[in-house]
Amino acid sequence: MVKYLLFIIAMTCCLCCNSFHKYPTVKIRQSMEKDTLLKSFGFSYIDLKGYKIIHINKRTNCILQPLVPLNKGEDNYFRLRIDKDKNTVYQIDSILSVGEILYNSRTMGIIIPITKYQNADDFSTVGEIQYFNTDELLSDYIEKNLENSEAACFDNRGLFCLYMSADTLFAYNIPTKEKKSIFIFNNPMMYSVELKLKNNILTLIYYPNFVEDFSNFNSAKIITFNYQE
């Protein structure tokens, strides 16, 4: 009887472990691709009229704050501050643009995709994705070299961050801090704007080419994937 119980416990632990480490998969849905028009990518300095407050939960807010330029050419940057119970618990400086800030109530984690630099010659961008846990007040980098993208989202359980960097879709295991490529577009000129997961359909909005002026309408594409965990 004892051996049988130990066997059941071992099998349960094994299944949980496999589920915990198993990476999601995607399969492109043909014929769902279509053109759309977007006015901007993320939230940039030109959209910022003073302070902007983004409510995360009852105790936590994100505040976007313009930076006072010290030198000429530095007036396009702003600061992101996370306040909990009216106290600043985290801060990111020198932000050019921020994508959609996402909160997962199960894990109490926040995903913050940001752009820090745009090349003046080819308009490519470099940024990062940061993760912050509002309960434990711990931060981490999901991606330190985010290329031409602000598209990121949580999986259904809040254990993975799905995101685009350059022309590759990644799945990042937040607890183990490991990432894996799960789809490649083979289009080095694409710029990813938004990634959303709903009802096991993963939707990506992207520009097929780099865009110079993000304040005007630009032709973008929407493509969907069948998503499986």
Features from the language model and the residues they span:
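Sec-dependent N-terminal signal peptides
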Residues: 7-9
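C-terminal motif of bacterial Sec signal peptides marking the signal peptidase cleavage site
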Residues: 13-16
